């Protein structure tokens, strides 16, 4: 790249070229339900073990009696200004869906939408390199891709993985009595909105980036614990939205200890400054009827859209110590945020 191109690249702020940010770009659960309500006859394949019926993180196809193939895709608009970091975050987020099923990634294909008349191709190159870096960290190749001229920058991956069928974890198989653990703090939507509002301090920006660039590779190890009954990642629908998928799929109620939910440093300070993403309101409008009465403060935390968020684990009390030991061994703070129980009311989530 020429010196003039480098100078131009350094002055470009990618978030100014998009109307949304990261997983906050997701179509709301309510609208998505309408989109997926197909009028066509249902086609079934006995080898498709996981489809979109349970809104799980990825599709799983039975290859033989022992191995399944995992397929997923995820892409979004810039959540940070730096192109390399944007690509790395987007790729890390896409790969996470493989880990959330308990699998290991095999390869990835890039998905790129780029406003070629607004942003230099050299910037797109940096975005793709960021994606390539995340793939390298996951031990896989960025094996190809597809690009289009688009009005806003978009980047992500289609990822293929594999899973030993005995280790397959889903989001709708939790059991009453399971304890709930979360592997990353909440608050990405709040901090990235603070960035758009030019309120985010540099040190807090780096904390958010570090969290979003952390691979959820621990999921493949968590899946080998037999007492882990359900597993998913927390992304654009927020903690409450993904917890509701766990509860509704298994017909259980979550007893959530809101005070135990880990938050990114100073997330509450930015929340007090009004840094609430639009995705938070869309999330609450979509599933708020299934939640208990919440203050605006509680809504802002529970419905905050995450990008490359952590894993939500439902584990039996008998296997809880094994999970805690595994997380500690990988320098992940084991944080229990609640439990699952047989419903005693119509509420899917209650606060304790």
UniProtKB/Swiss-Prot annotation:
SUPFAM superfamilies: PurM C-terminal domain-like, PurM N-terminal domain-like. The keyword Magnesium applies. Coiled coil: none annotated. One of its GO terms (molecular function) is magnesium ion binding. Mg(2+) binds at residues 57, 97, 233. It holds the Pfam family AIRS. ATP binds at residues 26, 54-56, 74, 97, 145-147. Synthesizes selenophosphate from selenide and ATP. PANTHER family: INACTIVE SELENIDE, WATER DIKINASE-LIKE PROTEIN-RELATED, SELENIDE, WATER DIKINASE. This is Selenide, water dikinase. It comes from Shewanella sp. (strain MR-4). The lineage of its organism: Bacteria, Pseudomonadati, Pseudomonadota, Gammaproteobacteria, Alteromonadales.
